[in-house]
Structure formats: structure tokens, C-alpha cells
């Protein structure tokens, strides 16, 4: 474990805490209709091939290309229509390989038939009992969805830890799954600290600010599939904070605070955390987001509840949640961590940078004449400037060891939109 009170790189900090976090929630069985947004507790394997039989991919005529290829195929074929196959009402009986079957999209292809000719390429007799067409460009299995083409029986349809999206709901339904085993939703307690913080909608005392962090963090928690527990605002009092943190740890799987983690006289979080449990690290070598505490709150039975003390400035709280807290919560909840989408871009202008910390700068993205991304660093980079975060397309990542960067330097940009 690195020195808890020396600034940690983002990677070192994430490793220090995530390596000691393991899945902590139990599994439960729920109806598929209620499973959206939840995380699978175990792999789901398909009980059968999907589709179960070869199906036509379009309206037309099914026939045996392999049988007819034995004849002279330079001339148009003239075949007798011997039956019909519709979706849900397949052709039954013997399909004469010297003839063809009228078939519609989604209908089962008769056994022994291995191609479908689109109806627009077919000429029909007045009675519809005879058709004529050329097989030019038609290969075996043309316009046929083969059995197991979407997913084979016994194959893993969705892996454990997958978040169940609308598309995943459709896949599970297509293989006949009506009940799924998912992880219980992770419960995350959220509270703000500080005498200067007030709830939105109420009066704003002189020198106070409305609490933007708690709503921000609760929405970020929901976005990763966990359930936030709103514990309100705790004033700058060590005993009160200790009481609230103990309570939070008793009802939640993880605890997040914002504010109270710098070195001000009224910032009690560090001392309280040391009295309640242990601290993995206290500072990050990043900007914004340097003052971030992470550790565990211990209870009397020896259980440990992960704790994250985020900075009071909203942009710093956002950056530290995305870089540290979110991945740890996903691991805790049994989810497969999802990395934030990233693009490679070039700086639109030279940018100042101090070696020894990773910087996350709000930026706008445009395409240059060659179609490559260009990152224009926003003028406002204050850690309290929420509007600049809303307006940004992404966060330009300036590497830990880099110094000043020249115009055109290649960087990663974490996408926000």
C-alpha cells in the first residue's frame, strides 16, 4: 500500500482501493420485464439455436440450388410452385427439389432447400403455378438466415456483470428467458458537508451556496445502475459528521461525502475517518480533484464499508467520481466496469502544463479539414465552474509526466456528450 498521505496518481489510487474491493451484493431472481438497467449475476446461455430453423430473409421463392445446379443453369429456370411457407405457418410435407415453394420473410425454409430468390427477380405465370428466374449471382444459402445464426444453443448470450440494456432485454426474450438472476442494486449513501451549503429551493443565507454536489452525485450513481440514498447536509462539526457516517455505513454498501477534505480548520473528514476506520489515500496527483479521501468505515462486527470523500468544488467532484468512485462502485456491485468513451484529438493551441499531475481540462471538439478531432481548451477551468462543464464536449487528458504541450500535440479526450 502506498503512503496514504502522499499524492497518488490516478492509476495508483484506483489500484489501491479497487484491489481491496470485491463484489458485496447478493443476487435475486426477477421478471425480465423488471430487469432493465440491472446487472446479471451469472452468465445466461441460450437454451436453443436462434433462429431455431433456417428462415427466409425476404419474400420470394425457396428452391434447391444444389439440386438444380446439376442441370444446365445457363438458361433461366422454370419451376412449378408446389406450396407456400409463411411465418408461423410453415410448409408441411415433402418439398419436391425439382420445384419451388412460395415463401415470405421470417418463414421456415423447407428441408432440402438452400436458397431463396427475391420475388422481384421472378416472372410468374398467370395462374401463379409456374415461375421463371435466373440463378445468376445466387449462392448456396442466399437470403436465408441459418439456424443458430444469431446465437447457437449452449452459447453464452450475455455474460455475468453485463448491464441489461433494452437490446439485452430483446435478446433474452428471443431465447425464451422470462426470469433473470441479477445483482441486488448497490445502495450508496450520499451527504454533503459544510456550514456554507444550503438545499436548493430554500432561502440562501449570506455567504452560503446552494448544494449542487449532492444532486450531481446522486444522478451519477443512478447512471451506473446503483441506488443513491440522500442523507442531506451535515454541518461542520466532527461529532455530527461521525454520527452521520456511522449511520450511513449501517444502511448502505458505500458512502460518499463531498466537501470537508481539504486542509481548512473546519474540514473534519480526515480526523473523523481515522477514528472510524482506515484511509487508503488522501490526495490525488490530478487537477481538478487533488483533495480526495478514500478508505473504509469499520463497524463493530468487523465489516468494512467503502468510503469516498470528494472535493467540495462540483467539477472536481465530477472528475474524481468518474476516475475513481464510479469504477469502484461498479466493482462493488458486481458489474463489469465500463470505460468512458475516448477519442484521440490534437490540441488546437499550445497549453500550459506542470509535470507531476494529470490534468482534465474542459474542451470543445471540432473536426479539421482531414476529419481529425481538434480539442479547443475552454477559457474557464475553475473547479467551481459548472456551466463550463455543461458546455464542454469532453475532458482533455494531459498526461501526468507531460510539461507544456504544443499546438497539435496528440491527447486523449474523455467524451461527455
Regions found by a protein language model. Give the residues of each.
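Short, low-complexity N-terminal leaders and the immediately following helix N-cap/first helix
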Residues: 1-73, 102, 146, 335-360
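Helix-rich terminal scaffold detector
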Residues: 2-11, 178-310, 314-320, 331
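Short, glycine/charged-enriched hinge/interface segments at domain edges or termini
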Residues: 2-5, 62-230, 235, 374, ...
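Conserved active-site and cofactor/substrate-binding residues in soluble primary-metabolism enzymes
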Residues: 5-12, 27-30, 34, 58, ...
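Flexible glycine/proline-rich
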Residues: 14, 28-33, 42, 88, ...
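Residue-level signal for inorganic ion chemistry
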Residues: 17, 60, 154, 190, ...
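Structural signal for hydrophobic packing residues in well-ordered secondary-structure cores
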Residues: 18-25, 43, 109, 155-161, ...
